[in-house]
């Protein structure tokens, strides 16, 4: 395929003026060989494994960034779900493994380490429960470690016991970091249909079907897409808008493919996937909500928002799929409220509500992300919100998730500051009519008929 000089110039302009970057180069590592009978031995093996395997990740990524002029924002590590390592270890508190991961992450210089995780969509094993019980202490004691728990799949339905357990865990995480605006909750995601090759945090894990070591790359570029849409004629129809987004997504993805292949080659590991997700940052203009407003919605959250987001998501996937044969991960537009300046503005103006975000989740990637809510929100209400997110994922055979942050001492209208890529956000209201009966019923929500694909 011939690349014209003007296309190269366009890509350079995207980088220099519109915040185009590679959001993350994530090294996935298998920790299966680290399992042992003693918690301290597991922690030692985990530290040694990560520092040995990931020692060159940051220097290699930085060298690629310099040589090609492509900003790489984060270098990250994902590991085997830690619950899989502790079955033969009797320790009730397994947070020492998280602390070892955090120390190893600091040693090799990465920004985040994901994989303090468990998959409990059909039932909660003894090791899974110990890991989940350790999440609040683990996230409170670490800076880089992220946790995730899968509670539902289209094939299995929703584990309602796990949903309520995770709601209580979210509350416990908030309490454990109440002096830091519940920051532990920003590092915890509850999933439906979790994927094995997600390079983005906080939900990255290294799945059981992955090789021992693999590079997965997550692209970014909302600012570049917004600029392209804004450059169109005001009279351009939606087909033209979709075509322009598709062409831009292709260019962004080719950049991600280049970085992924080169990083894998230099590190001597497998090239896994390029995640086609558009990931916003708090920087002005680097916003998914700004794209929706450029398409024509007066304010993100207004009527037409879900349609515009569906158009955006579809066009990005189509363009990205032309740019790489290794598309994977979550691959869709992200809508994390605190990380998107235009979304924060929409919440402050009353245009964007939790219920509208739920509708948007049905057509994009993940969904209820980085949402700050009142600290006194009951666990049963949080369980209801998580359950709604899971129901959308189960029914539509897609990955959905909730990253909810009940901030102690804060109420609707207050502001919370997380810093860095996590941004800041106003506290959003939550419908108070959940009650307690539904959340406490327990059991499993049966899988839909659509889950029987064979």
Where are these regions (language model features)?
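Anaerobic metallocofactor- and corrinoid-dependent redox/one-carbon enzyme cores
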Residues: 1-454
């Amino acid at each position: 395929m011939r690349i014209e000089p003007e296309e190269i110039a366009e890509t350079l302009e995207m980088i220099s003026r519109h915040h185009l970057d590679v959001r993350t180069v994530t090294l996935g590592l298998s920790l299966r060989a680290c399992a042992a009978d003693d918690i301290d031995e597991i922690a030692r093996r985990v530290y040694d494994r990560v520092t040995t395997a990931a020692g060159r990740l940051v220097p290699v990524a930085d060298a690629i960034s310099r040589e090609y002029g492509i900003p790489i924002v984060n270098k990250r590590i994902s590991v085997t779900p830690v619950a899989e390592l502790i079955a033969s270890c009797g320790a009730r508190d397994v947070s020492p493994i998280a602390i070892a991961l955090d120390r190893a992450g600091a040693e090799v210089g990465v920004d985040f380490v994901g994989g303090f995780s468990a998959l409990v969509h059909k039932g909660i094993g003894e090791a899974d429960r110990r890991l989940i019980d350790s999440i609040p202490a683990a996230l409170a004691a670490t800076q880089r470690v992220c946790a995730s728990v899968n509670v539902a799949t289209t094939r299995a339905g929703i584990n309602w016991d796990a949903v309520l357990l995770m709601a209580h865990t979210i509350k416990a995480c908030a309490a454990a970091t109440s002096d830091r605006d519940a920051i532990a909750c920003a590092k915890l995601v509850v999933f439906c249909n979790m994927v094995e090759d997600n390079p983005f945090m906080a939900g990255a894990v290294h799945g059981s079907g992955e090789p021992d070591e693999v590079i997965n790359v997550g692209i970014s570029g909302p600012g570049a897409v917004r600029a392209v849409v804004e450059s169109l004629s005001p009279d351009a129809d939606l087909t033209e808008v979709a075509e322009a987004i598709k062409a831009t997504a292709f260019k962004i993805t080719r950049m991600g493919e280049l970085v992924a292949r080169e990083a894998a080659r230099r590190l001597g590991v497998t090239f896994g996937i390029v995640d086609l997700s558009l990931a916003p940052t708090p920087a002005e203009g680097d916003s998914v909500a700004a794209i929706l407003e450029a398409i024509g919605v007066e304010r993100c959250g207004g009527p037409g928002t879900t349609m515009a987001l569906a158009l955006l998501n579809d066009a990005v996937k189509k363009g990205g799929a032309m740019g790489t044969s290794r598309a994977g991960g979550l691959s869709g537009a992200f809508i994390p409220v605190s990380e998107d300046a235009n979304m924060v503005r929409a919440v402050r103006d009353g245009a964007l509500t939790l219920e509208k975000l739920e509708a948007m989740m049905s057509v994009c990637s993940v969904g209820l992300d980085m949402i700050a809510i009142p600290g006194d929100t009951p666990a049963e209400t949080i369980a209801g919100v998580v359950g709604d997110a899971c129901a959308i994922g189960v029914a539509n055979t897609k990955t959905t998730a909730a990253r909810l942050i009940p901030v102690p001492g804060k109420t609707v209208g207050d502001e919370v500051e997380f810093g860095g890529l996590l941004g800041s956000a106003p506290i959003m209201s939550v419908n108070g009519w959940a009650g307690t009966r539904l959340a406490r019923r327990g059991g499993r929500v049966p899988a839909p008929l659509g889950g029987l694909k064979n």
